[in-house]
Swiss-Prot record:
Organism taxonomic ancestry: Eukaryota, Amoebozoa, Evosea, Eumycetozoa, Dictyostelia
Pfam families xref list: UPF0552 (PF10574)
Protein name, UniProt field: Arpin
Task performed by this protein: Regulates actin polymerization by inhibiting the actin-nucleating activity of the Arp2/3 complex. Involved in steering cell migration by controlling its directional persistence.
Species: Dictyostelium discoideum (Social amoeba)
Subunit field text: Associates with the Arp2/3 complex.
Family designation: Belongs to the Arpin family.
One GO BP annotation of this record: negative regulation of cell migration
Amino acid sequence: MSSSTNYSGTFTKERFCGGDGFIVEGILQKHNIHTVFLQAKQPLQDTVLPTRYVAITIEFDNAVKRNWKDGVEIPPKMTRATAITKGYLNKFDRVQATLVDKINADQLSVAISDGNKNSSLPSNFHDDAIKNLHPNKKNYFEFWADVDKFSHKIFKSGDEVRIKTIGDSIFVDSVVKMDSNNIANFSGDSNLGDSFASNIMKRYDQIESNNQQQQEEEDDDEWK
């Protein structure tokens, strides 16, 4: 199955891929080949985007902004898990660490649609798909992966996938299937073995749990 678009505007990375980008997780619904036929000359000084894509449709689960430092991607920003003392025995109520830059489906749609209020796709990219995508079909998004880079990827409907976008756009920087054997972390696509939200929570919670245990042991020693 394939589809195509005749596009008469500027189709460059500089035009559509500003911003830090997003990490998006969801359930793969379908994928097909989509071709963009450019009808206008493109700026010579800019980077023209590819014109053949694997169009990946997912049902949105969650998303977070990508985080960078000095041009290197680092894990998303987190609040620290905290322990609040209660009573004279210094018992603790715990406040779990949370992702600072987590976004919902509506926020993602606005960010990647280039101002198109009727769809999560920019105008004239693939208008036939609009009725089947957020916000018209809640939580359904289409992302475009360069055929030359991603056609070898083997996915099927129902797979849980994680997509990193190039800037705040629908264009795919990386995509991985999330299973026990092949799971990507935020910054380096190395094996971790869990979804990104729960994975990073576990790491922060473990650190805070160790700190809390040490504090409780010190408090107990004071009562001996």
